[in-house]
A protein has these predicted regions:
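Short, low-complexity disordered leader/linker segments with a strong preference
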Residues: 1-23
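Extracytoplasmic substrate-binding proteins
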Residues: 9-10, 20-22, 101-180, 201, ...
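Short helix-initiation/N-cap motifs at beta->coil->alpha
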Residues: 16-18, 71-82, 119, 205-217
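A short, structured surface patch at a secondary-structure boundary
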Residues: 29-87, 91-96, 196-199, 209
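Short secondary-structure boundary segments
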Residues: 34, 96, 118, 231-235, ...
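Short helices/loops that flank or line small-molecule/ion binding pockets
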Residues: 80-88, 108-109, 214-224
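His/Asp/Glu-enriched short active-site or ligand-binding loop at hydrolase and phosphoryl-transfer sites
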Residues: 186-209, 267
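Short, surface-exposed loop/helix-turn segments at secondary-structure junctions
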Residues: 235-251
Length: 296
């Protein structure tokens, strides 16, 4: 519902949680509190319209925002009400994980807050981009981003379609505590799109919002995967990446697993496994190149 006058355009949108936001002009002082929305907004709006990125912007292990882009925006902010208010934003983009107190306080002051969910698959990711594009008044640009994603994915699919189904490899991805990638979560979707069989999906119940299931060593042994995908993001300086590699290689529980016997332990950056933007296509390509280098 767009009514135009010489001075302003009024439009309304719904965020991912169904809350209605009304704008009388395109937002020009945007604060993004999540790394995924940093990345989406960077392709939707001129950086002059961004007053702050999330705290991870420019960290190449988790964010696709370059150091140059982070410097151009010049400010990073966490879920801190005072820090956000100082920036005088006309739109704050948050996630369902953002503190409810912060969201409420911003709304009470009259600052629009757009909340995104975490997509579980490609369709939901495209919807996230399309909806956010509408919120910042850039629907056409949103469509262009999605078209580019579709094209890149199609080209990748052409390469991967040469692989007979019996040659698909089974992979299990790990974070620093255990195996990950339950059926129905985003990593499961990414592996499937890369023509990789997600070992963890076979032994876990589908994702539900409330239950987190630990994938045990015994489950991993039962799966007997061809490849282990290991993490490399040392987010709190306490993770020993190389040490974790040796720990898994030398774990007696895994000694008969194909991945260990054939030394197929590969590192995949967390910016791919926890992707939350149009870069999902980069994640699919990264996994495919890691598991099937011979196709590239």
């Amino acid at each position: 519902s767009v009514s135009k006058s010489a001075a302003s355009i009024t439009y309304e949108v719904f965020d991912d949680t169904g809350r209605k936001l009304t704008f009388n002009k395109k937002p020009e002082r945007i604060v993004s509190l999540t790394y995924g929305t940093d990345e989406i907004l960077t392709e939707l709006v001129d950086l002059k319209r961004m007053v702050a990125f999330s705290r991870w912007a420019g960290d190449s292990e988790i964010s696709f925002i370059t150091k140059e882009q982070a410097l151009a925006v010049g400010c990073k902010v966490a879920d801190n009400l005072e820090a956000i208010l100082k920036l005088e934003p006309d739109l704050v983009v948050a996630s369902v994980a953002t503190s409810n107190d912060v969201v409420q306080s911003l709304e009470n002051i009259g600052i629009p807050v757009y909340i995104v969910r975490s997509p579980h698959n490609y369709q939901e990711m495209c919807a996230k981009i399309k909806n956010l594009a509408a919120a910042v008044g850039e629907s056409k640009k949103g469509d262009v981003i999605i078209k580019n994603m579709d094209n890149r994915l199609h080209n990748l699919e052409v390469k991967l379609s040469h692989l007979p189904s019996y040659q698909r490899k089974v992979a299990v991805a790990f974070n620093f505590t255990s195996a990950m990638g339950r059926k129905g979560d985003l990593l499961d979707s990414i592996l499937t799109m890369a023509h990789v069989i997600n070992g963890a999906a076979a032994v876990t119940p589908p994702v539900s919002e409330h239950k987190s299931v630990v994938i045990s060593k015994e489950m991993v042994v039962t799966i007997n995967p061809d490849i282990f995908l290991l993490p490399i993001w040392n987010y709190n300086n306490k993770q020993d990446v190389q040490g974790y590699y040796y720990e898994i290689m030398n774990d007696p529980a895994y000694k008969n697993v194909k991945a260990v016997q054939n030394r197929q332990l590969k590192f995949v950056s967390d910016k791919y496994r926890y992707v939350a933007s149009q870069h999902i296509v980069d994640a699919v390509e990264k996994i495919a190149r890691t598991v099937y280098p011979e196709l590239f």
